[in-house]
Amino acid sequence: MYDNLKSLGITYPEEIDRYSLRQEANNDILKIYFRKDKGEFFAKSVKFKYPRQRKTVTANNAEQGYKEINEINTNLRYVIEELDQICKRDQVEIDLKHKILDDLRHLEHVVANKIAEIEADLEKLTRK
């Protein structure tokens, strides 16, 4: 699992926190950030540079002939797919945690309102 990341020398893909991807000239720069250990100020990161692939394709108009385009490196595409699996899995866990906390806060609110309603009913009974 995560063969492309392991081929980059990343032995523990589960330690990946996030990644960024940017383009500089004819290269794509991938930066992978790992989870911080307790007491660390900065997360450890590694950077990889991938040259963009050049392709010659036919232009829209028959008059123009061919044009050259640059696109993302195929290997980088596979690495990003694996990174998305890791980072989205973490996001799903975070979203689930937020949902559970939201449900818990809502339940607290409902119970507090019900207790107040019952106490008000008791108060009415004791006044009579």
Curated annotation (Swiss-Prot):
Transmembrane segments: none annotated. InterPro entries: UPF0325. It comes from the Bacteria. It holds the Pfam family DUF3461. NCBIfam families: PRK13677.1. Belongs to the UPF0325 family. This is UPF0325 protein plu0668.
